[in-house]
Amino acid sequence: MTDTSIRNAGTWLADRALIRVAGEDVRGFLQGLLTQDMAAVTAEAPQWAALLTPQGKALFDFILWADGDAILIDCEAAQREALIRRLSLYRLRRAITILPVEGGVHWSPDTGKGVPDPRLAALGYRWLEAEAGAHATGWRAHRLGLGVTEGVEELGQDKTLWLECNASELGGVSFAKGCYVGQENTARMHYRAKVNRRLVVAPLGEPGDRTRATYPDLGLMVELRRVEALGDALMPEWLVAALAEPPS
């Protein structure tokens, strides 16, 4: 059951921002860079994806939305300019624009407006519109309560392998598409079942070397732990199922 205070709160995720990628063969350009198959990105089906290092470590994670022939990137507001700069390095002489655009990302845990979050249906609904209304105050607690991590603070930047971020289980990677930055090591880990560590949410404790983020107000922390030593980590159904099944 969704908490009434969350249901009645605002919907605008003020810590998110949008980038518009447009121009010649935009999907082909992003297909060779990102972890997600661009053919899966439609107006009704946004997709979670990432830009990785060549070694397969997460640099930026975001949600991709179709906008006609263009693609909108729903990313951390604090990382928008850095992400634009990074993507622009790969543009070379392509007739492609990568620009910040106005607009807000909105969320509700249980309204029929928008589309289900591509990572996990239980996260709720997400949609894009003008930056209007009150801020969504319950998003972080709702997300972490489901064991889902996101953003540079929690995932790290050039620190955590993408599959250690539970990308396979939460739909953030395609193993059927062609090459992209970081694909070789990511695919090798998947097919050899070599994902030995996982980012997990746990009750707040003494921070250590493996701690990525702490939220004293929520009594929670995010840590990278070995799968045989998850300890008191929250174990949502999706993670339990993932650890019980061999990779396909």
PLM regions and their residue ranges:
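Basic, glycine/lysine-rich polyanion-binding surfaces/domains
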Residues: 1-248
